UniProtKB/Swiss-Prot annotation:
MF (Gene Ontology): ATP binding; ATP-dependent protein folding chaperone
N6-methyllysine: modified positions: 774
Domain of life: Eukaryota
Keyword hit for Cell cycle: no
Alphabetized InterPro entries for the sequence: ATPase_NBD (IPR043129), Heat_shock_70_CS (IPR018181), HSP70_C_sf (IPR029048), HSP70_peptide-bd_sf (IPR029047), Hsp_70_fam (IPR013126), HSPA4_NBD (IPR042052)
Gene name, Swiss-Prot/TrEMBL: Hspa4
The entry's keywords: Acetylation, ATP-binding, Cytoplasm, Methylation, Nucleotide-binding, Phosphoprotein, Stress response
Biased composition (Basic and acidic residues): 514-533, 789-802, 830-841
Annotated Gene Ontology cellular component terms: cytoplasm
Positions bearing Phosphothreonine: 540
Protein name, per record: Heat shock 70 kDa protein 4
Protein localization: Cytoplasm
Residues annotated with N6-acetyllysine modification: 53, 430, 680
Lineage: Eukaryota, Metazoa, Chordata, Craniata, Vertebrata
């Protein structure tokens, strides 16, 4: 079973796998551990990753990047509207109202959903992992920003399904970093001790996230998170791009933003310049040849000037840091360390701001680029039964408060209540109780829209079906279980109606009490102390109490009333049972039919990419063969081909080369396969003659050595040398005969081959020589390597017990003499022989 962690970044992605030796970040086909989050669409196939990145400028309209933030967002979303001007490709509104990506693929215009494009990238990362692990990859853990909303998380989950992955957990990026940090720490405080508080700061290309975590031995608890969803490395790039657009506009009279390719080139150069300025404080040049209208442009920038231009961005670094301390109610002195990751934290001014705020040196013990993917791989290993990992519990938080809203018959209007407050532990479940006579709907929403980086606070609607009143017409008790799961996704996971049945007393009067207690126990196990706070008030004000209290009160009241009855009167007995209720939901998520369709389409596109790759490989094989043979015909193959054959073959190679760049530019795979076979029919005999000429002398030499060795053994045997005197004369004669035959065969073939021209096929082939060597060895080797028979040494006669003299006058004992006499006259058994020896010992 594979264990894979995927860091699905805005600009680049990383894949880590768990192996017996630990966690390893794997490299792609370009030997690079960083895979660009980029997909390019062509007339015949898709390019994904590094291959797509190289087409950003040449195929700008059909190369998609920066699509991560479109997950779960409507086309009318203000964020999407703001992003349009930064995109080289077109985005469109899909029939669902969501954002789609418009490209030309396979010679026709296509609209892809964000989930489909992300699935393409995930498929590529999956392929990379499979090529390294040499086995299928299914289970994985994928990272998402901690500020992702329910809709965005569901969208990423859909993308993983389209890619054929089973996502065990959507893991918040800062939580993954915290896991990578904490699981290897051996000096964490014990569970009963005060936890170690560590702040994790992650500033990537598109966003800025901060979390504070409490560590104990084998335990990680996220206390609070804060973020700036638009502050990242690309904002600093934009400062440079805008500066040089303005400078080059004045200096060279160029309107750079009117030409998307020029803008993309400038963006790439500005990103390089920003990275250089992180290590150099001096003036650095920026030069681009043939930038626009065949004009070369150049400019300079230094770190000091750059930081001045970024003052407003740097001012946004502190607020999230202050926010996590306020939320967690911690002081700066309570923070043990501040760990920074993410590419943008390499900017010196950013590091300085963070360090100054906490008043301590920053910790850089984690790999800034790979910490997230390593944390995801560790989480996948923890969840996988295939790996034994040190126990480490992870408690995350809910980033935004979640509330429920419903129609209240008692209040004749809407009622609502906060189910999960901000920074509530996750994953977590709660059981809520409602009193209803008919089906009802719960609307889940984020209760602080002002803090939400998303225009719509609505999460979903859940309709509880088949709710009926009790047999006496009263409202039924409905238990609803709500949950924030490991992915950070909210749902109403189940609903059950409690039916009350009254009957006469049976032989087991205590069963009702026991059932009630079990019911209460189950409810307590599933919920926190505040679970019942959002139950709906029943029709009668007197019943406005917690569920458990109502049950206990009603049972107690019933007993009190029945106490004064005559003994012969039968007591009423209450039994309860639960009935599961169906739930219908309205979500920002793809339905099963669309998921199946997109999965099928992804499979077709993968197959098309594979076929196109095979076609290109076949074409490249023809081109490679043409160049190889043309060079070798005038080189090492020159002696092995006649003048006429060389001229004919050379002409054929030239014709093939011209065909490749004309009619053969775009042909099916089989045409290239046939063309290569046609060329090899002319070239292979020449290549074979060359190879035979190279290998034949070596094999003849080996055969000659074998013959000499066996002749030497025969001579030694005839000279009656001790080493071979044990051999049978008939066997040696057999060796001599085989050796002489092999020598005659070799001399004959050598003479014929020496008379043969190199331009024709050889008289004897290497396979024949190898067969002769094998034949000679199989006959002679067993005979000459026959070992000498072992000469056994003469056996020593066993010593008798009577040879030992009497000890301490024992010889005078008559009994002893009798025993000795008996030993001399009788024939003892094996056991009897050993007895005297044992006595003497």
């Amino acid at each position: 079973m594979s264990v894979v962690g995927i860091d699905l970044g805005f600009q680049s992605c990383y894949v880590a796998v768990a192996r017996a030796g630990g966690i390893e970040t794997i490299a792609n086909e370009y030997s690079d551990r960083c895979t660009p989050a980029c997909v390019s669409f062509g007339p015949k196939n898709r390019s994904i990753g590094a291959a797509a990145k190289s087409q950003v400028i040449s195929n700008a309209k059909n190369t998609v990047q920066g699509f991560k933030r479109f997950h779960g967002r409507a086309f009318s979303d203000p964020f999407v509207e703001a992003e349009k001007s930064n995109l080289a490709y077109d985005i469109v509104q899909l029939p669902t109202g969501l954002t789609g990506i418009k490209v030309t693929y396979m010679e026709e215009e296509r609209n892809f959903t964000t989930e489909q494009v992300t699935a393409m990238l995930l498929s590529k990362l999956k392929e990379t992992a499979e090529s390294v692990l040499k086995k299928p990859v299914v289970d994985c853990v994928v990272s998402v920003p901690s500020f992702y909303t329910d809709a965005e998380r569901r969208s990423v989950m859909d993308a993983t399904q389209i890619a054929g992955l089973n996502c065990l957990r959507l893991m918040n990026e800062t939580t993954a970093v915290a896991l990578a940090y904490g699981i290897y720490k051996q000096d964490l405080p014990a569970l009963e001790e005060k936890p170690r508080n560590v702040v994790f700061v992650d500033m990537g290309h598109s966003a800025y996230q901060v979390s504070v975590c409490a560590f104990n031995k084998g335990k990680l608890k996220v206390l609070a998170t804060a973020f700036d969803t638009t502050l990242g490395g690309r904002k600093f790039d934009e400062v440079l791009v805008n500066h040089f657009c303005e400078e080059f506009g004045k200096k060279y009279k160029l309107d750079i933003k009117s030409k998307i390719r020029a803008l993309l080139r400038l963006s790439q150069e500005c990103e390089k310049l920003k990275k250089l300025m992180s290590a150099n404080a001096s003036d650095l040049p920026l030069s681009i040849e043939c930038f626009m209208n065949d004009i070369d442009v150049s400019g300079t920038m230094n770190r000091g000037k750059f930081l001045e231009m970024c003052d407003d961005l740097l001012a946004r670094v502190e607020p999230p840091l202050r926010s996590v301390l306020e939320q967690s109610k911690l002081k700066k002195e309570d923070i043990y360390a501040v760990e920074i990751v993410g590419g943008a934290t390499r900017i010196p001014a950013v590091k300085e701001k963070i360090s100054k705020f906490f008043g301590k040196e920053l910790s850089t013990t984690l790999n800034a680029d790979e910490a997230v993917t390593r944390g995801c791989a560790l989480q996948c290993a923890i969840l996988s039964p295939a790996f034994k990992v040190r126990e480490f519990s992870i408690t995350d938080v809910v980033p935004y408060p979640i509330s429920l809203r419903w129609n209240s018959p008692a209040e004749e209007g809407l009622s609502d209540c906060e189910v999960f407050p901000k920074n509530h532990a996750a994953p977590f479940s709660k059981v809520l109780t409602f009193y209803r006579k008919e089906p009802f709907t719960l609307e889940a929403y984020y209760s602080s829209p002002q803090d939400l980086p998303y225009p719509d606070p609505a999460i979903a609607q859940f309709s509880v079906q088949k709710v009926t009143p009790q047999s006496d017409g009263s409202s039924s008790k409905v238990k609803v279980k709500v949950r924030v799961n490991v992915h950070g996704i909210f749902s109403v996971s189940s609903a059950a109606l409690v039916e009350v049945h009254k009957s006469e007393e049976s032989e087991e009067p205590m069963e009702t009490d026991q059932n009630a207690k079990e019911e209460e126990k189950m409810q307590v196990d599933q919920e926190e102390p505040h679970t019942e706070e959002q139950q709906q008030q029943p029709q009668t004000p007197a019943e406005n109490k917690a569920e458990s209290e109502e049950m206990e009160t009603s049972q107690a009241g019933s007993k009190d009333k029945k106490t004064d009855q005559p003994p012969q009167a039968k007591k009423a007995k209450v039994k309860t049972s639960t009935v599961d209720l169906p739930i219908e939901h309205t979500l920002w998520q793809l339905d099963r039919e669309m998921l199946a369709l997109y999965t099928e389409n992804e499979g077709k596109m993968i197959m098309q990419d594979k076929l196109e790759k095979e076609r290109n490989d076949a074409k490249n094989a023809v081109e490679e063969y043409v160049y190889e043979m043309r060079d070798k015909l005038s080189g090492e193959y020159e002696k092995f081909v006649s003048e006429d054959d060389r001229n004919t073959f050379t002409l054929k190679l030239e014709d093939t080369e011209n065909w490749l760049y004309e009619d053969g530019e775009d042909q099916p795979k089989q045409v290239y396969v046939d063309k290569l076979a046609e060329l090899k029919s002319l070239g292979q005999p020449i290549k074979t003659r060359f190879q035979e000429s190279e290998e034949r002398p070596k094999l003849f030499e080996e055969l000659g050595k074998q013959i000499q060795q066996y002749m030497k053994v025969i001579s030694s045997f005839k000279n009656k040398e001790d080493q071979y005197e044990h051999l049978d004369a008939a066997d040696v004669t057999k060796v001599e005969k085989s050796t002489n035959e092999a020598m005659e065969w070799m001399n004959s073939k050598l003479n014929l081959q020496n008379k043969q021209s190199l331009t024709v096929d050889p008289v004897v082939k290497t396979k024949e020589i190898e067969a002769k060597i094998k034949e000679l060895t199989s006959i002679c080797s067993p005979i000459i390597s026959k070992p000498k028979p072992k000469v056994e040494p003469p056996k020593e006669e066993p010593k008798h017990a009577e040879q030992n003299g009497p000890v301490d006058g024992q010889g005078d004992n008559p009994g002893s003499q009798a025993a000795e006499h008996g030993a001399d006259t009788a024939v003892p058994s094996d056991g009897d022989k050993k007895l005297p020896e044992m006595d003497i010992d």
